[in-house]
Curated annotation (Swiss-Prot):
Family designation: Belongs to the glutaminase PdxT/SNO family.
Cysteine pairs bridged by disulfides in the record: none
Keywords from the named record: Glutamine amidotransferase, Hydrolase, Lyase, Pyridoxal phosphate
Gene responsible for this protein: pdxT
Chain positions recorded as L-glutamine binding sites: G52, E53, S54, R108, I136, R137
Organism, as annotated: Haemophilus ducreyi (strain 35000HP / ATCC 700724)
Gene Ontology cellular-component annotations: cytosol; glutaminase complex
Record-given protein name: Pyridoxal 5'-phosphate synthase subunit PdxT
GO biological process: glutamine catabolic process; pyridoxal phosphate biosynthetic process; pyridoxine metabolic process
Length: 189
Protein backbone atom coordinates (compact mmCIF):
# COMPACT_ATOMS: atom_id res chain seq x y z
CA UNK A 1 0.00 0.00 0.00
CA UNK A 2 1.20 3.52 -0.82
CA UNK A 3 2.21 5.88 1.98
CA UNK A 4 -0.30 8.74 2.18
CA UNK A 5 0.70 9.90 5.68
CA UNK A 6 2.03 13.25 4.44
CA UNK A 7 -1.28 14.17 2.79
CA UNK A 8 -4.34 15.93 4.18
CA UNK A 9 -7.72 15.20 2.64
CA UNK A 10 -10.72 17.33 3.53
CA UNK A 11 -14.36 16.33 3.63
CA UNK A 12 -16.82 19.16 3.07
CA UNK A 13 -18.72 19.04 6.38
CA UNK A 14 -22.01 20.73 5.55
CA UNK A 15 -24.16 17.60 5.00
CA UNK A 16 -23.71 13.91 4.38
CA UNK A 17 -21.71 11.04 5.84
CA UNK A 18 -18.69 13.12 6.85
CA UNK A 19 -17.51 10.78 9.63
CA UNK A 20 -17.67 7.76 7.33
CA UNK A 21 -15.60 9.50 4.64
CA UNK A 22 -13.04 10.56 7.27
CA UNK A 23 -12.77 6.95 8.49
CA UNK A 24 -12.06 5.71 4.96
CA UNK A 25 -9.42 8.39 4.36
CA UNK A 26 -7.72 7.55 7.66
CA UNK A 27 -7.87 3.81 6.87
CA UNK A 28 -5.57 4.56 3.92
CA UNK A 29 -3.09 6.41 6.15
CA UNK A 30 -3.85 10.02 5.17
CA UNK A 31 -4.86 12.77 7.58
CA UNK A 32 -8.53 13.76 7.26
CA UNK A 33 -10.27 16.95 8.34
CA UNK A 34 -13.87 18.13 8.32
CA UNK A 35 -13.96 21.30 6.21
CA UNK A 36 -16.36 24.02 7.36
CA UNK A 37 -14.35 27.19 6.68
CA UNK A 38 -12.77 28.53 3.51
CA UNK A 39 -9.34 28.89 5.16
CA UNK A 40 -9.18 25.12 5.67
CA UNK A 41 -9.05 24.55 1.91
CA UNK A 42 -5.46 25.86 1.88
CA UNK A 43 -4.35 22.89 4.04
CA UNK A 44 -5.70 20.27 1.65
CA UNK A 45 -4.11 17.97 -0.89
CA UNK A 46 -7.52 16.60 -1.95
CA UNK A 47 -11.21 17.03 -1.12
CA UNK A 48 -14.34 14.90 -0.81
CA UNK A 49 -17.77 16.37 -1.59
CA UNK A 50 -20.18 14.03 0.25
CA UNK A 51 -23.81 13.23 -0.35
CA UNK A 52 -26.68 15.36 0.88
CA UNK A 53 -28.99 17.61 -1.10
CA UNK A 54 -27.12 19.56 -3.79
CA UNK A 55 -29.21 22.75 -3.73
CA UNK A 56 -29.03 22.97 0.07
CA UNK A 57 -25.31 22.22 -0.05
CA UNK A 58 -24.77 25.09 -2.50
CA UNK A 59 -26.66 27.49 -0.21
CA UNK A 60 -24.54 26.38 2.74
CA UNK A 61 -21.33 26.74 0.70
CA UNK A 62 -22.34 30.27 -0.27
CA UNK A 63 -23.30 31.16 3.31
CA UNK A 64 -19.91 29.91 4.58
CA UNK A 65 -17.93 31.67 1.84
CA UNK A 66 -16.80 28.33 0.39
CA UNK A 67 -18.56 28.37 -2.98
CA UNK A 68 -16.35 30.79 -4.93
CA UNK A 69 -13.16 29.27 -3.52
CA UNK A 70 -14.32 25.75 -4.39
CA UNK A 71 -14.90 26.85 -7.98
CA UNK A 72 -11.16 27.57 -8.25
CA UNK A 73 -9.98 24.62 -6.11
CA UNK A 74 -7.93 22.54 -8.54
CA UNK A 75 -6.70 19.64 -6.44
CA UNK A 76 -8.12 16.09 -6.63
CA UNK A 77 -11.82 15.87 -5.73
CA UNK A 78 -14.16 12.93 -5.17
CA UNK A 79 -17.83 13.88 -5.36
CA UNK A 80 -20.27 11.22 -4.11
CA UNK A 81 -24.01 11.34 -4.87
CA UNK A 82 -24.88 15.04 -4.35
CA UNK A 83 -21.14 15.71 -4.69
CA UNK A 84 -21.37 14.30 -8.22
CA UNK A 85 -24.13 16.82 -8.97
CA UNK A 86 -21.95 19.64 -7.62
CA UNK A 87 -19.17 18.64 -10.06
CA UNK A 88 -21.40 18.44 -13.16
CA UNK A 89 -21.48 21.11 -15.84
CA UNK A 90 -25.08 20.26 -16.80
CA UNK A 91 -28.05 19.09 -14.71
CA UNK A 92 -31.24 17.77 -16.31
CA UNK A 93 -34.35 19.59 -15.15
CA UNK A 94 -32.94 23.08 -14.98
CA UNK A 95 -31.22 23.02 -11.58
CA UNK A 96 -28.55 25.69 -11.45
CA UNK A 97 -25.07 24.36 -12.23
CA UNK A 98 -22.80 24.49 -9.20
CA UNK A 99 -19.00 23.99 -9.44
CA UNK A 100 -18.97 22.74 -13.08
CA UNK A 101 -15.63 20.93 -12.85
CA UNK A 102 -16.52 17.97 -15.07
CA UNK A 103 -17.99 17.72 -18.57
CA UNK A 104 -20.89 15.54 -17.48
CA UNK A 105 -24.67 15.81 -17.72
CA UNK A 106 -26.53 14.33 -14.75
CA UNK A 107 -30.01 13.21 -13.79
CA UNK A 108 -30.84 13.80 -10.12
CA UNK A 109 -32.59 11.06 -8.08
CA UNK A 110 -32.38 8.81 -11.13
CA UNK A 111 -32.69 5.57 -9.18
CA UNK A 112 -35.88 6.57 -7.39
CA UNK A 113 -36.78 7.55 -3.86
CA UNK A 114 -35.16 6.64 -0.54
CA UNK A 115 -37.25 3.47 -0.33
CA UNK A 116 -35.72 2.34 -3.65
CA UNK A 117 -32.17 2.33 -2.23
CA UNK A 118 -30.07 -0.76 -2.94
CA UNK A 119 -26.59 -2.29 -2.83
CA UNK A 120 -25.09 -4.19 -5.74
CA UNK A 121 -21.70 -5.60 -6.77
CA UNK A 122 -20.32 -3.16 -9.35
CA UNK A 123 -17.51 -3.77 -11.82
CA UNK A 124 -15.16 -0.77 -11.67
CA UNK A 125 -12.37 -0.17 -14.16
CA UNK A 126 -9.02 -0.61 -12.39
CA UNK A 127 -10.39 -2.66 -9.48
CA UNK A 128 -9.67 -6.39 -9.37
CA UNK A 129 -13.05 -7.44 -7.97
CA UNK A 130 -16.55 -5.92 -7.85
CA UNK A 131 -17.21 -3.00 -5.49
CA UNK A 132 -20.23 -3.20 -3.11
CA UNK A 133 -21.95 -0.03 -4.37
CA UNK A 134 -24.69 1.51 -2.18
CA UNK A 135 -27.21 3.63 -4.12
CA UNK A 136 -29.45 6.00 -2.11
CA UNK A 137 -31.64 8.38 -4.16
CA UNK A 138 -28.67 8.36 -6.48
CA UNK A 139 -28.10 10.42 -9.60
CA UNK A 140 -26.48 9.03 -12.70
CA UNK A 141 -24.51 10.53 -15.56
CA UNK A 142 -26.44 10.64 -18.84
CA UNK A 143 -23.68 12.11 -21.02
CA UNK A 144 -19.91 12.50 -20.75
CA UNK A 145 -17.56 14.87 -22.55
CA UNK A 146 -14.65 13.61 -24.63
CA UNK A 147 -12.11 14.01 -21.80
CA UNK A 148 -14.21 12.04 -19.31
CA UNK A 149 -13.30 8.42 -18.58
CA UNK A 150 -16.19 6.12 -17.63
CA UNK A 151 -15.07 3.87 -14.75
CA UNK A 152 -18.35 2.08 -13.98
CA UNK A 153 -21.86 1.64 -15.32
CA UNK A 154 -24.98 0.11 -13.79
CA UNK A 155 -27.71 -1.08 -16.14
CA UNK A 156 -26.30 1.07 -18.94
CA UNK A 157 -26.02 4.24 -16.83
CA UNK A 158 -22.69 5.84 -15.94
CA UNK A 159 -22.26 5.81 -12.15
CA UNK A 160 -18.51 6.50 -11.77
CA UNK A 161 -16.43 8.76 -13.99
CA UNK A 162 -13.09 10.57 -13.94
CA UNK A 163 -11.92 13.73 -15.65
CA UNK A 164 -8.34 14.67 -14.90
CA UNK A 165 -8.13 14.42 -11.10
CA UNK A 166 -11.86 14.80 -10.48
CA UNK A 167 -14.06 11.77 -9.72
CA UNK A 168 -17.87 11.75 -9.90
CA UNK A 169 -19.46 8.84 -8.04
CA UNK A 170 -23.23 8.21 -7.99
CA UNK A 171 -23.09 5.74 -5.12
CA UNK A 172 -21.88 5.93 -1.50
CA UNK A 173 -18.50 4.16 -1.11
CA UNK A 174 -18.18 5.55 2.43
CA UNK A 175 -21.10 3.38 3.58
CA UNK A 176 -19.11 0.20 2.97
CA UNK A 177 -16.02 -1.33 4.55
CA UNK A 178 -14.30 -1.16 1.14
CA UNK A 179 -11.92 1.80 0.73
CA UNK A 180 -10.90 1.17 -2.90
CA UNK A 181 -12.87 4.10 -4.35
CA UNK A 182 -11.21 6.43 -1.83
CA UNK A 183 -7.88 4.86 -2.82
CA UNK A 184 -8.54 5.94 -6.43
CA UNK A 185 -8.72 9.54 -5.18
CA UNK A 186 -5.58 9.24 -3.05
CA UNK A 187 -3.68 7.68 -5.96
CA UNK A 188 -3.93 11.11 -7.63
CA UNK A 189 -1.67 12.61 -4.94
Amino acid sequence: MADYSRYTVGVLALQGAVTEHISQIESLGAKAIAVKQVEQLNQLDALVLPGGESTAMRRLMEANGLFERLKTFDKPILGTCAGLILLADEIIGGEQVHLAKMAIKVQRNAFGRQIDSFQTPLTVSGLDKPFPAVFIRAPYITEVGENVEVLAEWQGNVVLAKQGHFFACAFHPELTNDNRIMALLLAQL
